[in-house]
Swiss-Prot record:
Protein name per the record: Uncharacterized protein p61
Lineage: Viruses, Riboviria, Orthornavirae, Kitrinoviricota, Alsuviricetes
Species annotation: Citrus leprosis virus C (isolate Citrus sinesis/Brazil/Cordeiropolis/2003) (CiLV-C)
Major site of localization recorded for this protein: host cell
Keywords, in A-Z order: Host membrane, Membrane, Signal, Transmembrane, Transmembrane helix
GO-annotated cellular components: host cell membrane; membrane
Membrane topology (UniProt): Multi-pass membrane protein
Compartment annotation: Host membrane
Signal peptide boundaries: 1-15
Segments traversing the membrane: 459-479, 490-510
Amino acid sequence: MALFQLFSFLNVTLGLVSNIYNSTGHLSIDKACSGYSTEVFKGVCLPSYSYVKVDRHILTKDDRYYLGYAKATNREYQLYSLHIGTYDLFGSDIMSCGARGYALGLHNGDLELVLNYCRKVDGQKHIGEVFQSCRFVEYSEHMISGIVHSIPKDLMEEFSPIGKVPYFGIMPFRTECADQCSTKQAFYAMDAYPFYNIGYWFPLCADKYIPLCYSGRTDPCPLGYEERLIKVHSYMEGFESGMKTVCKSGEYIFPAWYSGQSEIYDTVVKPYIVNVPEYCGRFSRSDKSLVYSRFGFRGTIFSGLKVITLDGIDYLTTDFCVNYSMHHYVKPLVFERMRKSFICTSSGCLYKGFDVNHLHDICTPKLIVKRHEALISSFSFINTLGTKVGAVPYDFDGNIIQFIDVFSIDGFYVYSLSHKKIQTLTVMLVQSEEEWYMKLLHFVADDILRECLSTVFKVLFSAISACLSFIIDVGGCCFRQFIFVCLDSVILLLLLLPNYTHLTFILGFTLNAYIQLVYYESCCFRAYRDIAETIDL
């Protein structure tokens, strides 16, 4: 089945609203470089993989899904697989025999990882097998204790290809051989069978926008929400549209609590950890997206994408643009930068900053999409695939806008991040404009002020000139020369201020005084004339 058909399947079960499952954890390979090596499995140093969260869109009580953590190990290597949600494709119970579906999660193998722990019984390979009777035989608390058990080597099927980098993606599975394994329950007890999945029925505790924590274990919807049936269309051949049960209040829609087949729930799904309020704190919203790596390509699963419907037409947009365009909430940085961009002077007030109109224009919904495909096509394996159909702003940081580029491939969409610098805009908002009589007053004031200043400076300079003349008359010519030397020294001092030293100032003052009073002809000393007469002789 083609990869994009898998996306189409996810559209059926996940395609309406966003519900974020957040978790923190660490997956790694113990002694990944140790000596297990065959033609199929090459010993490879697999890096540790930290996972943050997974986007899901809609899961209802009419679907079957669970969380699982699988671990297979022997002395040479370990296999980890974190299944965050396994979805039923054909309407059968994933806990029964013959069920088929796809596991969306974190794996450290190929997309079609081959597992078969019933090989000794049926001798056949299956893709991502899930065995009910084998898996949940002798259920006990030590199943989730993390105790490492050894697997009998004759039960191990070669993992092909296991030497791949960890990736986040989809793994097909089907449940088989429950009847065959049921006769071997003692042999396949958990002590000898460490590969397991622990199942929990949804919903998970989510963020404050989608309250998935209930007051009771059997309540289909929390207080304030009513149970509704909605029709979900299918894009898979041979699979008809179905009715899904959801909880609805205002604009919020999320899955109703699964309450059917309580006997299976009680025997298989223990303990009740996803529906207890004290566990809700573990599922708080953090980062906006999960960044993953697959076969050397990096991609992002975006949680900020939204599809909004205006006049019956579906547009792709983002949380940032919806909030910005509708003036409901904007990242504080936007308001802060706008506030600092307003400048007021005596001539008026202006705005000099990022182009607000441009930001508003590119956030206006324009990119028409198919609602379901847009919400589930959140994988960006290779950025250059498909035809680019547009871009939507994703975030704003300073003068840089981050965009999500949208590419179309066979009716589905691939997203990748890009960025662009927003232009600076200058707009005069308020300009000072005076009345005619104010201009006349300014003209009169200018003339009066000019005359006043002119008179003040004339009187001041006349007083200084009279003082200097009096000093020279009283002190004589030599005293005048000394005053000039002092004034020169003041100028010298100002020039020396950046690198002032006492020695430099004293030497400069002495040299200047010698030149002014001794070397040149002056009324104080006649050394210059005596030297000149001596040279002439």
